[in-house]
Regions:
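HIT superfamily nucleotide-processing domains
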Residues: 1-140
């Protein structure tokens, strides 16, 4: 995998505001600060996206996510928290080193983060849903 801005941050070539680090992961403030406390969690073992990340690395990420989330909660007491992970250009991934956004949400904030899901439940009947589920199940 080619070098990314995140690998340079891990190596200390680019400064960051470190939040948490262990042998496997590194968490730091996102420079955009979509909301106060917006943090990124990345594995030190680089992979482009979730499709290329091994289960052991994902285990370390899963262990670190609640540590970082709870630190944000204790620091700022947000009303909620989004954890977002994008895979591929068409899913809005901009740095091709797997990463997780922890975005605190505040009732009174106008944070510019519009995250509204449109529902298609009326357009997809139960038979189609069963076929979709079956197609995915066959590949587990």
């Amino acid at each position: 995998m080619s070098e990314t801005i995140f690998s340079k941050i891990i190596d200390g070539e680019i400064p960051s505001y470190k939040i948490y680090e262990n042998d496997y992961v590194y968490a730091f403030l996102d420079i955009s600060q979509v909301s106060k406390g917006h943090t990124l969690l990345i594995p030190k073992k680089a992979s482009e996206n979730i499709f290329e990340t091994d289960p052991e690395t994902m285990k370390h990420i899963a262990e670190a996510l609640p540590i970082v989330a709870n630190a944000i909660k204790k620091a700022f007491n947000p009303d909620g928290l989004n954890i977002i992970q994008n895979n591929g250009e068409y899913a809005s991934q901009s740095v091709f080193h797997i990463h997780f956004h922890l975005i605190p949400r505040y009732k009174e904030d106008i944070d510019g983060f519009g995250y509204i899901w449109n529902t298609n439940e009326d357009q997809i009947d139960d038979e189609q849903k069963a076929k979709i589920a079956e197609a995915i199940q066959k590949n587990v």
